[in-house]
């Protein structure tokens, strides 16, 4: 069975959630250049794969630190994640973590990898009560972002993770969202409400 899917039970018991690994799909292409620097910071590079748009159910993938990322395409999106992380309520963090070297000096940010299942998977497996709970958190987060004129731009259910540690995580904000995408965010949320029976 592929990672990220639910294990269905043949009995009347509800399906057991199977953990999958998801990452923000912002990872750096300059792997050979970054690997020595990451090793210096004590990061396990055997678990870090440098590729853009790694398949969703791949093994754990780490992203590069923003100050070392040279790609003109990746830096704006990384900055967007950091910007949104500062605005979203602490109970609904975006997956950004500070990184320090062995001396404790701040180095930059790295995007963590997350274990959990997507909102898409919850809906597909008819776990609608949990899907509604996750969606309520997303709505609260998006309202706060929109109040600050910040738009996510891609609120599809595959970009919402119900993490195994209890968090709800938003993935993959568009790097250059247009103001009119606020309406797009709202329409996507309305569609998700219908899918989970929240209306």
Name every feature range the model reports, one short phrase each.
Residues 1-15, 23:
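Regulatory N- and C-terminal appendages and interdomain linkers associated
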Residues 18-89, 93:
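ATP-binding glycine-rich loop module of kinase domains
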Residues 48, 91, 109, 169-172:
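Protein kinase-like catalytic core scaffold
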Residues 92-134:
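Conserved structural core of kinase catalytic domains
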Residues 115, 157, 175:
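Short, glycine/acidic-enriched loop or turn micro-motifs at the edges of active sites
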Residues 130-144:
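Conserved alphaE helix
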Residues 146-163:
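Catalytic-loop of the protein kinase fold
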Residues 163-199:
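C-lobe/activation-segment region of protein kinase-like
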């Amino acid at each position: 069975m592929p990672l990220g899917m639910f294990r269905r039970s043949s009995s009347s018991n509800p399906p057991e959630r199977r953990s999958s690994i998801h990452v923000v799909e912002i990872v750096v292409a300059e792997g050979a250049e970054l690997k020595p620097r990451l090793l210096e910071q004590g990061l396990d590079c055997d678990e870090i794969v440098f590729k853009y748009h790694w398949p969703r159910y791949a093994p754990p993938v780490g992203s590069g630190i923003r100050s070392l990322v040279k790609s003109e395409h990746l830096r704006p999106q990384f900055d967007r994640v950091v910007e949104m992380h500062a605005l979203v309520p602490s109970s609904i963090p975006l997956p950004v973590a500070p990184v320090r070297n062995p001396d404790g000096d701040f180095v930059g940010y790295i995007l963590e990898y997350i274990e959990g299942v997507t909102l898409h998977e919850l809906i597909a497996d008819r776990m609608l009560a949990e899907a509604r709970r996750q969606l309520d958190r997303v709505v609260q987060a998006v309202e706060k972002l929109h109040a600050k004129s910040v738009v996510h731009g891609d609120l599809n259910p595959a970009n919402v993770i119900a993490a195994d540690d209890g968090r709800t995580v938003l993935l993959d904000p568009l790097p250059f969202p247009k103001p009119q995408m606020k309406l797009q965010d709202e329409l996507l949320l309305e569609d998700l409400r219908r899918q989970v029976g929240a209306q």
